[in-house]
Structure formats: C-alpha cells, structure tokens
Amino acid sequence: MHPSGAPGEARRRRSYTPEGLFVITGPGESYGKGSAWMLGGEHGYVQAVLLRDSLAIHPDTLYIENIEVKPDRRGRGHGRILYLKAERFAENIGAKWIQIDSEAEAVGFWSEMGFTETGKLFYAGKTSMVKKIG
C-alpha cells in the first residue's frame, strides 16, 4: 500500500519499462555500463547488468544474470515471454549483445532463443553463450 493509504496507489506509481516489465531495482533514468536492474513481470523476474566492456565478450552487452519463473507457472512458455521482453529492454537501452552463463539443462532453451556457445568458461559448470540483437 502506498503511504497515502490508497490501495492501488503503489501499483499505479510503479515504474514500468516500455516492454511492460516493472522496475524492482535499477539505476533510474541515468545509467551506463555497470548499471544493474531487477525487472519483474506477471510470471517472474529478470536480473541483468549492462556490462563494462572489459568484462564482456563483445562491447555493449547486457548480461542476464538470472531469469526466474514462479514455480507454479513453469512449463507454460512464461520463461520465453520473459526473455523476449528482456531482449527488447536490452535493445531499448542500446545493447548490441546479450550474454548469459547457462546451466547445462537450459542450453537447449538458450540455443532455441538464438544464443551460441562462446567456448569460454566464466563459471564452473556453466556454458557461456551470446546473442547479437537489434
């Protein structure tokens, strides 16, 4: 509830991206490389950071740290929808690439989304993948 006491006021004042994701945390209107966001949707959330070029495989990369679908909504395509909204968000903030580190069981999903393996290892047991966007 909003401090004014109006039940719907907090939801109405929530900051939304043009893609329909609400901003749980973020840098505000002034952002740059190193800025991080937590974006929520009806079925889950996305954690992402605009990487500094020294940490990215390619310049202008949005790194998706995590996409989480609510447990009771899994297996119905909500992860795909959430990712596609995150991809549009990346394009809108000027990213040219998206980079992820995938769990082994999710590599097929990310390949279907257009990602390719980089052959680099950043985290043990995970597969580094990238996708050119825009």
Question: Predicted segment positions?
Answer:
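Charge-dense, intrinsically disordered terminal/linker segments
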Residues: M1-G26, R73, S111, G134
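Acetyl-CoA-dependent GNAT
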Residues: A10-P59, E65
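Acidic/histidine-enriched, beta-strand-rich ligand/metal-binding domains
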Residues: E65, G108-E112
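Conserved beta-strand-loop-alpha-helix junction that forms the acyl-donor binding cleft
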Residues: Q99-G108, F122-K126
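Conserved acetyl-CoA-binding loop-helix of GNAT-fold acetyltransferases
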Residues: V69, G75-R88
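Conserved acetyl-CoA-binding loop of GNAT-fold acetyltransferases
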Residues: S111-L121
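Short hydrophobic/aromatic beta-strand or adjacent loop that forms the aromatic wall/cage
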Residues: K33-G34, A124-S128
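Conserved GNAT acetyl-CoA-binding A-motif
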Residues: A90-S102
